[in-house]
């Protein structure tokens, strides 16, 4: 089954499917660990297996025709190409928050945000991957790495960007116990955003898709979903957002408008369900300390104080620039008081005809910036030094933002710059995308 034109898909999996629980993880009452015959785990997460190859790219059969047994089986087919076996493992460690209560009685859940590099984009923008061996760009190879990584992580919620083979992913994730929802970009684009959630942990109360083309903001899309924690005595709900912001650094007005619109719509939906806490995931295509990042963190921005081409900070993150200035580069933007903003650009950016101020109603914090990390992996504001690496970019553009009502209990630390540089560019033999997966475990704030 293939996507044709625009696609909005929502799937659920039969109740017989089991969760896959890694050793050392937090187990919720009522869940049982299943045998993991062909998968191995460490106390610190290993994001890549010791061997891999690409599964078939054939279309999965209709989910309605599948049968499921109670005995868990690895949803990934056997590897068949020993010449594609990774020679090493890249380890990432969990970092616990030193400020969040650690009581196991607190209800918790784990969220992943992952730009998986669309198959079409990896082919169309081949110049970005000039240092990557062709076999490691093949979707079959990368799909296996990505799915194995996610199965090892065993998150409760997954938000993906650049998804253009949704049904390939869904067939595997469904067998691992996930339900899913997909929103394709508008226009002629073939990729979009996807959400997956553990169907035995969360139920979906409401979903909303955002097409930014309806507001004159290009063909990007975003997703919102109200999820309710099952088997909770307190009717816990969260609002999950997922976005892939426009890449083009020159169109800061559109990038700002997309983020502003997502925050506004998330606020309305959260209010509708009783001011429920919010988690916003995605590739925001903006770097730490950039005006766009500061807009998310501070809730407002005077656009006339900035050049719209510098709102995202991306132009300062070419690999040669980052490596020349060192891993502690400040990504400082040279602000200019610009008269180059047109009335239409101001309207798109701020949502108003006669105001230079863009604002959003949320109080957001970044989960990674909230959990103290290592100088080898974090910048001066606490964000990862790099979440994405290809021949023209080395830096951070991916984030997990959260609102009041939630606290980050721990995050999966990213990789040091020197480790990333040894790959000469992502994806590589061990990593299936040009982005790293961001992972945060959240707890609900204790009541009163």
Curated annotation (Swiss-Prot):
<dbReference type="GO" id="GO:0005737">
    <property type="term" value="C:cytoplasm"/>
</dbReference>
<dbReference type="GO" id="GO:0004535">
    <property type="term" value="F:poly(A)-specific ribonuclease activity"/>
</dbReference>
<dbReference type="Pfam" id="PF03372">
    <property type="entry name" value="Exo_endo_phos"/>
</dbReference>
<dbReference type="GO" id="GO:0005634">
    <property type="term" value="C:nucleus"/>
</dbReference>
<keyword id="KW-0694">RNA-binding</keyword>
<keyword id="KW-0460">Magnesium</keyword>
<dbReference type="InterPro" id="IPR005135">
    <property type="entry name" value="Endo/exonuclease/phosphatase"/>
</dbReference>
<comment type="similarity">
    <text>Belongs to the CCR4/nocturin family.</text>
</comment>
<dbReference type="GO" id="GO:0003723">
    <property type="term" value="F:RNA binding"/>
</dbReference>
<keyword id="KW-0269">Exonuclease</keyword>
<feature type="compositionally biased region" description="Low complexity">
    <location>
        <begin position="50"/>
        <end position="67"/>
    </location>
</feature>
<keyword id="KW-0677">Repeat</keyword>
<keyword id="KW-0804">Transcription</keyword>
<feature type="region of interest" description="Disordered">
    <location>
        <begin position="50"/>
        <end position="92"/>
    </location>
</feature>
<feature type="binding site">
    <location>
        <position position="162"/>
    </location>
    <ligand>
        <name>Mg(2+)</name>
    </ligand>
</feature>
<keyword id="KW-0805">Transcription regulation</keyword>
<keyword id="KW-0963">Cytoplasm</keyword>
<keyword id="KW-0540">Nuclease</keyword>
<dbReference type="GO" id="GO:0046872">
    <property type="term" value="F:metal ion binding"/>
</dbReference>
<dbReference type="InterPro" id="IPR036691">
    <property type="entry name" value="Endo/exonu/phosph_ase_sf"/>
</dbReference>
<dbReference type="InterPro" id="IPR050410">
    <property type="entry name" value="CCR4/nocturin_mRNA_transcr"/>
</dbReference>
<comment type="function">
    <text>Acts as a catalytic component of the CCR4-NOT core complex, which in the nucleus seems to be a general transcription factor, and in the cytoplasm the major mRNA deadenylase involved in mRNA turnover.</text>
</comment>
<keyword id="KW-0479">Metal-binding</keyword>
<keyword id="KW-0378">Hydrolase</keyword>
<keyword id="KW-0539">Nucleus</keyword>
<protein>
    <recommendedName>
        <fullName>Carbon catabolite repressor protein 4 homolog 3</fullName>
        <ecNumber>3.1.13.4</ecNumber>
    </recommendedName>
</protein>
<comment type="subunit">
    <text>Component of the CCR4-NOT complex, at least composed of CRR4 and CAF1 proteins.</text>
</comment>
